[in-house]
């Protein structure tokens, strides 16, 4: 948790922005409740709601809060533990002491939330709340508000605030990236033919647990990189394969890191693997060189796809005018995802609030084209944005066949050559990037080895 002044300032700005936008009424926040796996005493791993963490910092279940836009009054709703709870949990701080730790002076029992919201509704006052991501809060909000819809004004205000990271947030993300570096180093050093992929996943995730942290999302580790988010780890590691590892750590403050590297299972890339790997590596470096304030990340995506197609043309996998290929969406055959996404308290930051609202400026319209349509972050960049830079090239047999059968290639794809890559898999390379006043910097103290010679040197030292 940060100093209480951080949370006081965040809530003050939110209230100020909402009032400046002409909004009235109350702002209602709900923290998460525990989610039972089978029964109420055996729950899924606890994770607090990210917007709750941002404005209140309290990392325990069943909290609520109301901010009054007219009076400025702030109230925390939660229940103090009783003797039955103390027997199982031990002594706990009072709700009031927890409220005071984040700069709130008034704390009342959780049950009074119903009364406060009902009173506001009877008086005709708007009740602003965010879209819930958990079933308990969905049901609770429906009961409290009579099925009212989330407040778009509040959603936009929260997005505007959370998109630009404060110094304390950047420090937390840097720390998460440092542990992410260690995770990937442990994984790279553990790659051996003949072992099961899960052994490597266990070492990576065990490292985060040994630090008292956790992972920022389920680890992706696979020799089938053509499946973009393959969470199965049951394969024996074979020689001559490419292993995609997409993983990150979550800091004690719940900020994420998200790195991807692609390793040769035998320690050296084959000539064909190196050709494709170098293209992806160059695209990653090129994209980073384009990141700076005032540039739309959509334009960086398109420029990176153009470079990728130029290089694939050099390998005779595509033929024709590269600009026409970009316009026709041929890049989506090889990279059917966007260049990157926002990152912060969520690894895909704030997507529970609406992916288009988070990733697109009001004057930007999301494309329907394969690849570009999956771009999660298209906005014009400003200092304080934290984004990922993650180009990839994938040879997906089913997608290749679809392009061929339906003529989606528009005559640009050299299928006779492309089909020789059907067993290739995929390559993705991802760094986490902070937009600065005059450009960008990669987050974390050091960058994971990425150039093919660097990767091979690191693997052959073992």
Where are these regions (language model features)?
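Active-site neighborhoods and metal-handling regions in enzymes and metal-associated proteins
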Residues: 1-462
């Amino acid at each position: 948790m940060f100093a209480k002044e951080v949370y006081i300032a965040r809530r003050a700005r939110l209230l100020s922005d909402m009032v400046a936008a002409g909004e009235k009424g109350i702002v209602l926040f709900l923290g998460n409740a525990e989610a039972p796996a089978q029964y109420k005493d055996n729950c899924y791993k606890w994770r607090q709601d990210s917007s709750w963490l941002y404005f209140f910092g309290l990392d325990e279940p069943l909290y609520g809060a109301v901010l009054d836009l007219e009076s400025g009054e702030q109230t925390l709703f939660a229940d103090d533990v009783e003797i039955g709870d103390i027997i199982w949990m031990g002594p706990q701080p009072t709700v009031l002491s927890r409220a005071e730790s984040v700069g709130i002076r008034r704390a009342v029992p959780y049950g009074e939330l119903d009364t406060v919201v009902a009173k506001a509704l009877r008086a005709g006052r708007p009740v602003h709340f965010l879209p819930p991501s958990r079933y308990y809060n969905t049901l609770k909000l429906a009961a409290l508000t009579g099925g009212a819809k989330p407040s778009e004004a509040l959603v936009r205000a929260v997005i505007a605030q959370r998109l630009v990271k404060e110094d304390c947030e950047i420090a937390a993300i840097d720390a998460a990236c440092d542990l992410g570096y260690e995770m990937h180093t442990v994984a790279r050093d553990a790659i051996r033919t003949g072992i099961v992929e899960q052994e490597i996943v266990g070492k990576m995730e065990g490292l985060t647990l040994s630090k008292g942290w956790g992972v920022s999302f389920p680890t992706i580790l696979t020799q089938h990189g053509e499946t973009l988010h393959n969470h199965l780890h049951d394969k024996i590691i074979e020689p001559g394969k490419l292993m995609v590892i997409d993983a990150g750590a979550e800091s004690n403050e719940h900020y994420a890191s998200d790195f991807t590297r692609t390793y040769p299972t035998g320690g050296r890339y084959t000539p064909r693997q190196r050709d494709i790997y170098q293209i992806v590596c160059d695209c990653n470096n090129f994209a980073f060189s384009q990141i700076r304030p005032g540039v739309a990340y959509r334009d960086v995506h398109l420029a990176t796809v153009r470079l990728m197609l130029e290089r694939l043309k050099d390998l005779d996998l595509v033929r024709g005018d590269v600009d026409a290929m970009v316009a026709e969406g041929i890049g989506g055959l090889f990279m059917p995802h966007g260049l990157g996404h926002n990152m912060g308290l969520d690894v895909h930051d704030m997507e529970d609030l609406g992916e288009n609202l988070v990733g697109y400026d009001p004057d930007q319209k999301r494309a329907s084209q394969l690849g570009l349509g999956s771009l999660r972050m298209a906005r014009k960049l400003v200092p304080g944005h934290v984004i990922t830079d993650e180009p990839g090239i994938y040879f997906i047999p089913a997608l290749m066949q679809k392009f061929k059968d339906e003529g989606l290639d528009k005559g640009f794809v050299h299928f006779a050559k492309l089909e020789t890559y059907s067993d290739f898999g995929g390559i993705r390379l991802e760094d986490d990037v902070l937009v600065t006043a005059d450009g960008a910097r990669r987050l974390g103290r050091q960058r994971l080895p990425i150039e093919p010679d660097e990767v091979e040197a690191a693997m052959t030292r073992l």
